Amino acid sequence: MKFKMVHENYNVFDLEKSMAFYEKAFGMKETSRKNADDGSFIIVYMQTPESDFELELTWLRDMDRPYNLGDQEFHLAFVTDDYEASHTLHSEMGCIC
């Protein structure tokens, strides 16, 4: 029996801001979108051209405050062909801790 990871989901408070971050930081593009008929949620799938793995971003209409991530550690890992350029971009974006 074999398994293949196909996506990872993050709930986001600001969908457009989150999408812009992943596009600028990693070159990800929207591949599909699901809008709930009642407007209660939007799910956006994004991926890089180099991979079929998708990032799923979920926006929930009824969430009225930013998510409290607490002490839960999570991460999304990428490989790059240009470490220095990637490090420079991510430093300029303020997303390196």
Which ranges hold each PLM region?
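Vicinal oxygen chelate
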Residues: 1-6, 29-78, 87-97
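Conserved active-site tyrosine of GNAT-family acetyltransferases
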Residues: 18-23, 90
